A protein has these predicted regions:
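An anion-binding loop in the catalytic cleft
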Residues: 1-9, 192, 201-220, 225-362, ...
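Donor/substrate-binding cores of folate-linked one-carbon enzymes
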Residues: 2-4, 55-218
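A short beta-strand-loop structural module common to alpha/beta enzyme folds
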Residues: 25-37
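Conserved CoA-thioester-binding segment of acyl-CoA-metabolizing enzymes
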Residues: 320, 324-418
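A structural preference for short, pocket-lining loop segments at secondary-structure junctions
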Residues: 375-377, 394-442, 453-470, 496-498, ...
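Crotonase-fold acyl-CoA enzyme core
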Residues: 461-467, 472-476, 487-498, 502-577
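C-terminal long alpha-helix characteristic of the crotonase
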Residues: 548-613
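Fungal intrinsically disordered, low-complexity serine/threonine- and proline-rich regulatory regions
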Residues: 661-708
Length: 708
């Protein structure tokens, strides 16, 4: 079947769906940049089926009336609107359909819904109201303070979406067979798939996997949840509600708070409930502690809330969004806190990185496990926001790894160390911190060297002591995060993990010793394709080529159990993984040479004329600048013979290519300046007319910078 994915962005859900569908179908992707773009894409692809896994705009009538078009909605049947997950995580439970009253009077549910779902429905004129082809549900606990909208989306929502989409496709195939009375075993005539196919009533009432009705309560269409309705009041809301509001707004747009001056979007929402909280006698909203660039404030019910990140509010005069950065640097810059005067009522983290046994903010900790044979294993959990690892966070990780090494003695040896990421394993360097730096190139250099130091521990320091290293991917990984995993002796990955090894799409050569680890693991040719194709890779695909060693079933607690079981068996049977290293020179000299060569290329990416490719792409990514077109590597329906994306060409690596671009840009800027000076010279005689022409010209040239 030919399937077209229409999406606002090729995100974690659409990538997972793409990888699943391509096993059986011919799939192509188009960014929904405009109505005309979507109509043109459908015309070029001429698909049998269109699926919209992540779409924030309306499907054009010309598309859904001609092609069977499915919308993946992150809500249960009957729910509708763009803020489904947000409302659910805040405590909307369907008992009161007057959502404005719920918001204004804080009539949120005490415990929230027990279940939520994902619905695959057919696109029609009315938003999220078409015939249901399939839906799936999952359990949810909205007061688990570690769950955010984005982590729920990457986890349970994505898994449910895959089940619902697969079921919907099967049902559409069945309906197509029935329209032409195709015999069992005969190939389906895909041309029979049309918007006129009819669903069955039970598709709306019974879940795809179990056939059960929706167990999460009554649902109804809900409006867009505006930023003004997401804020918290420290004099009215307790820790649980504030946590809900912040976590429900995670990723986009953030929780807009007016409790600090100036107003800003905040992220995090983790609850602090240490035994000392009852002794801290300060007003609600008062800052009571700092930890790893996060800040905690007191709540009216005697607990605390951690703000880990913040973002300035975009003004009408701001060309783009501001970066999302760690809270403390932002708060200091805005004058919200003075570190010299900020009290520290909360206990410090343990020096040995032990896990705390009460609700708090702790993004990195170590647990030691002694298996039945008496051998010791260290589990290092690191759960950095959005998987990004800043310079400071990399240094913290190095300190934790050093602490683990110090426990390894002749009398009490350590057999293995396991790197456990969080809902993301790692996405490499912290682009938002880099973008917000006064000198992004310098911060990029510091960050890449810091993450290289982390990987050197994995490749060398543990290896020379005979300690097995294991990377256990419970969540997605990208760029330097994939290289971090690849450096381990053994890579375990959950079956739902998606990996994006390439750096080029961001305009980087990449470091993290990837030129030696990828070569050792997958070979030269496969490694070249990993980096140049710039396509997502599933856990099973990664295993097929050697990037992953073992794919484990399950997720959540079941995956954790599988990881511990596999590591215990590995250690107890004295297995020595890491065969990929056997023919490699991993001596200190070879590693230093590799690092120097990679950093030589990265220096070009940070400071030479070629740096344009990285600095511009990083800025667009961080500030959420809308793409101008879909990359041809995704939009197969647009690619002509021999046609390449800019990042796919060899010239993308040449400094000369970008030096010419710099000269051309400078010439255009000079010409623009000359034209503006000419306008100013004429302004005295015809001021009104010239001002209007000048205004229109600026809007045309800089329209992308002056959106509200």
């Amino acid at each position: 079947m030919k399937i077209l994915l229409l999406c606002t962005a090729h995100n974690s859900l659409s990538q997972r769906l793409y990888l699943t569908l391509t096993l059986k179908h011919e799939v192509t992707v188009e960014y929904a940049l405009s109505t005309d773009t979507m109509i043109e894409a459908a015309s070029l692809a001429h698909p049998h089926l269109i699926i919209c896994p992540f779409l924030t705009s309306t499907v054009p009538t010309e598309v859904y009336t001609k092609y069977m078009t499915l919308i993946v909605h992150p809500g249960a049947p009957g729910d509708g609107g763009p803020s489904a997950l947000d409302f659910m995580l805040m405590g909307e439970d369907g008992t009161d359909e007057d959502i404005e009253r719920v918001i204004t009077k804080d009539l949120w549910s005490e415990h929230g819904r027990s279940h939520w779902g994902v619905t695959v429905l057919q696109a029609i004129e009315k938003f999220d109201a078409g015939p249901v082809w399939a839906w799936e549900q999952f359990k949810v606990n909205i007061d688990d303070h570690t769950i955010t909208k984005s982590s729920l989306y990457r986890g349970d929502v994505t898994r449910a979406a895959l089940i619902a989409c697969s079921t919907a496709i099967e049902r559409i195939e069945l309906a197509a067979r029935q329209t032409k009375a195709t015999k069992t075993g005969e190939a389906v005539d895909w041309e029979c798939i049309s918007p006129g196919l009819e669903t069955k009533p039970e598709y709306r009432t019974a879940s795809a996997s179990t056939g059960e009705p929706f167990l999460g309560g009554h649902t109804c269409p809900l409006p867009l949840l505006k930023a003004a309705n997401r804020g918290f009041d420290v004099h009215r809301h307790g820790a649980r509600m504030i946590s809900r509001l912040i976590r429900a707004s995670d990723s986009q747009p953030g929780c807009l708070t007016r409790n600090f001056s100036p107003n800003l979007y905040v992220y995090g929402g983790l609850i602090e409930d240490c035994e000392h909280m009852s002794t801290i006698e300060v007003k609600p909203g008062t800052f009571i502690g700092v930890r790893n660039d996060a800040v905690c404030f007191k709540t009216l019910d005697g607990k605390g809330i951690w703000i880990t990140h913040g973002r300035r509010v975009k003004r009408k005069t701001d060309p783009t969004l501001w970066p999302k950065v760690p809270a403390i640097p932002l708060f200091v810059d805005l004058g919200i806190v003075d570190l010299k005067k900020l009290p520290q009522f909360l206990p410090l983290l343990p020096e040995d990185f032990a896990k705390l046994d009460y609700p708090t903010f702790q993004e990195l900790y170590v647990e030691y496990d002694e298996i039945a044979t008496g051998q010791r294993v260290a589990y290092l959990t690191f759960d950095f926001y959005n998987g990004a690892m800043s310079t400071n966070q990399c240094r913290q990780m190095c300190a934790a790894l050093r602490s683990i090494l110090e426990t390894h003695t002749d009398s009490n040896p350590l057999s293995a160390v396991v790197l456990l990421g969080g809902t993301y394993f790692s996405n490499g360097i912290h682009l938002n911190v880099i973008e917000s730096s006064p000198d992004p190139a310098h911060e990029s250099w510091a960050n890449i060297n810091a993450i290289n130091d982390v990987i050197l521990f994995v490749l060398h320091d543990f290896a020379v002591r005979g300690i097995t290293t294991v990377a256990a991917l419970r969540g997605n990984a990208a760029a330097g995060g994939v290289a971090l995993a690849a450096a381990a002796d053994l890579v375990l990955a959950g079956e739902h993990v998606v990996m994006n090894p390439a750096y080029r799409a961001l305009g980087l050569f990449g470091s993290e010793y990837h030129t030696i680890t990828y070569h050792g693991r997958v070979g030269h040719d496969a490694g070249h394709h990993l980096l140049r194709d710039m396509l997502p890779v599933s856990a099973h695909q990664a295993k097929d080529i050697g990037l992953v060693d073992v794919v484990l079933p399950g997720y959540g607690e079941s995956l954790d159990t599988a990881i511990h079981k596999h590591v215990s068996e590995l250690v107890s049977t004295n297995q020595k993984p890491g065969r990929w290293k056997h023919n490699l020179d991993l001596s200190p000299l070879a590693l230093a040479t590799t690092r120097m060569q990679e950093l030589g290329e990265m220096a070009k990416d940070f400071w030479s004329a070629r740096s344009i490719r990285y600095h511009s792409r990083r800025s667009d990514f961080v500030r959420k600048v809308k793409a101008t077109k879909t990359p041809l590597r995704f939009a197969r329906h647009r690619r002509k013979v021999g046609e390449l994306d800019e990042e796919e060409s060899d010239s993308f690596d040449l400094i000369e290519t970008f030096a010419m671009l710099v000269r051309k840009t400078q010439e255009q800027a000079m010409q623009q300046t000359i034209e503006q000076l000419k306008m100013q010279a004429r302004r005295a005689s015809t001021p009104a007319t010239v001002e209007e022409k000048d205004k229109r010209q600026l809007e045309m040239l800089f329209s992308c910078y002056y959106g509200s």
